[in-house]
Amino acid sequence: MVDVGCFAQREGEIPEPGPEQALLRVLSVAIDPAIRGWLNERGSGYLPPLGLGEPVRSNGIGVVVRTTTEALPVGALVTTLTGWQEWALCCSDFSDIAKLGTVIPEGITPVEALTVHGQIATTSYVGVEVVAKPEAGETMVISAAASAVGSLVGQMARRRGALVIGIVGTEEKRSWVTDELGFEACINYRTDDIASSLLQLAPKGVDIFFDNVGGEILDTVLRRMAMHGRVILCGTLATSNSVEPYRLQHWERILSRRFSMTGFNSMDHWDRFPEATAAVTQWLADGSIKYRAHVLEGLDRAPEALVRLFLGDHLGKLVIEVADP
């Protein structure tokens, strides 16, 4: 388990941008489950693990202060993997996917960009509109339903007419997703039996499971999948701190119920970023989707925030404000 003692602050020189690069003054950084995977020796699978002494990799927002590319002009608000640092370089091409910078449209604040736009919007939008494609009347279950991605996915699925059931870990989160976001029901995995709850809430089975956590919750929902359903694998929050991988006990249901399991990453669909941003902006404006951010001030609180993420001690997207815009 990661604790705050695993991290230390260091000072370094501000880097100069190379060809097709921009220097960002970092304004905010997001605290995401993916960070934990990058801290493991084996990495996350799609980006290499971090070495000791390297800045923690993290999605962030910064303002361009120096640039060598017209695609990232001075003054632009840009999202990239800034890391836990006050200054960061990004690039305007795909020469380094981990440092690809994308300009955020005007009128969007740094916290909004990390909470409901950028990677969050693209992941949620692609997950629903391209991968899951819920249809009216289908039952869709979402784990980590009060998270930034989980809450958006649920609201987007409801817009398509799906019956949405969330899985969360506190009563406060359960109330938020049902009372404010409009989910049909929500299961508290700490107090409710997931299998029996799903039998009651979805007696004909689960058509779509959008999974952000993996582990035992994934294994349990597999038992309740409907014939020809689909499981969308988006995250492994429940097993990020595990030394040994969780071994599924109910994998045979994939065969007997003939449902599919699909893993996806928004990096494979970054060309949909403008489309996702436009859609989310419109849905925010017309009130059909809502969001919540849990903001902490100061880069020194980033380790604390990461610990809180895995304890579930927050409501909404965890964001660190590094500097004033």
Feature-to-residue mapping (PLM):
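C-terminal capping/lid region of NAD(P)-dependent oxidoreductase domains
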Residues: 288-295, 303-325
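Short amphipathic alpha-helix with an adjacent loop that forms part of the alpha/beta core around
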Residues: 193-203
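Short, glycine/polar-rich helix-capping loops at beta-to-alpha or helix-loop-helix junctions
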Residues: 86, 169-177, 245-251
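N-terminal Rossmann-like NAD(P) cofactor-binding module of classical short-chain dehydrogenase/reductase
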Residues: 79, 141, 187, 207-210
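Glycine-rich phosphate-binding loop and adjacent beta-alpha segment
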Residues: 216-289, 322-325
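NAD(P)H dinucleotide-binding glycine-rich loop of Rossmann-like/cofactor-binding domains
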Residues: 56-63, 73-144, 288
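Mid-domain Rossmann-like dinucleotide-binding core that forms the NAD(H)/NADP(H) cofactor-binding site
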Residues: 114-192
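Glycine-rich beta-strand-centered segment in the early N-terminal region that forms part
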Residues: 11-31, 41-84
